[in-house]
Amino acid sequence: MTNQTRNVVVVDCLRTPMGRSKGGAFRHTRAEDLSAHLMKGILARNPQVNPSEIEDIYWGCVQQTLEQGFNIARNAALLAGLPIEIGAVTVNRLCGSSMQALHDGTRAIMTGDAEICLIGGVEHMGHVPMNHGVDFHPGMSKNVAKAAGMMGLTAEMLGKLHGISREQQDEFAARSHARAHAATLEGRFKNEILPTEGHAADGTLFQLDYDEVIRPETTVEGLSQLRPVFDPANGTVTAGTSSALSDGASAMLIMSEEKANELGLKIRARIKGMAIAGCDPSIMGYGPVPATQKALKRAGLAIEDMDVVELNEAFAAQSLPCAKDLGLLEVMDEKVNLNGGAIALGHPLGCSGARISTTLINLMEAKDAKYGLATMCIGLGQGIATVFERP
């Protein structure tokens, strides 16, 4: 370890298209395949990097069982044919897993334990459902409401506490689909999506190069017809205002600033600040607020300094209170989730942290922005945030 921490930079970031979990293009594609494809793809885009110099792979994944079990990070690296000397570990901080992978890799480089790390994450929610094998200890109910394990009910609770109306949620969800669809049509996702083999409806193989989860036909009127799904009698949260179920993977290539300069690689962003925070599990969706406040303080910046923000859209009823308390509601159209978010693209749990960071970096470049924030809520009451700076 060195005594002085070093600057850590992102030299590239990439993701698969988001596949629909129910009968989508990746229905015959395993989570390891999505991961291995990205690992190979990001290295192919950066031939200056000798794979043997990668110290470790940190890969987020939540449901670590079945095809995602037994250290999927290592399994995917072996499947990709990467040098056997590279280490690999699977990281789990639920929804924040691949952002946690970014933080872990960043710290390893900061302290001098690594020069180059590959980070990312995956979740195939079609093959391994979110609730597969979940078995909470009954004694937890002494400290945590049972409903805190039901994400939709925590969104209902947070929405009620902050007076978020059904209409506001429907408008936010329609915005997500509209912006994601516009981003697709205008090619704004092109640089971040690695075309990935999938199966068409008739079973033939094809290269998927767009997010098939987006519903361009979504309207506020259409959403208003949906029934509340978690609290049918009194609720406001519907399937339409919740993040879609999707399958996908994301990856980022990070290294010390010195190494990037030595290899002649373009520095796309620096990691400027990182934080996690806990909050009441019953309003787990509020986690981005304390996590962002911590990360900004560590970066010596304020929310007003952020030119672009990616706030993971677990639920509209959760995103809006966070945006409100972070002081972002007035600048939504200039700064927040400009290419839509998880309501349109889906929230493959282990993938999303690096996914929103990848989208953020591409948006920062498109807007010639200096600072950006990526933040997300985490089941059972946590938040995670990363502040990025463009050189």
UniProtKB/Swiss-Prot annotation:
The active site is at residues 95, 347, 377. Pathway: Lipid metabolism; fatty acid beta-oxidation. It comes from Vibrio parahaemolyticus serotype O3:K6 (strain RIMD 2210633). This is 3-ketoacyl-CoA thiolase. GO terms for cellular component: cytoplasm. CDD domains: thiolase. The keyword DNA damage does not apply. Its main location: cytoplasm. Catalyzes the final step of fatty acid oxidation in which acetyl-CoA is released and the CoA ester of a fatty acid two carbons shorter is formed.
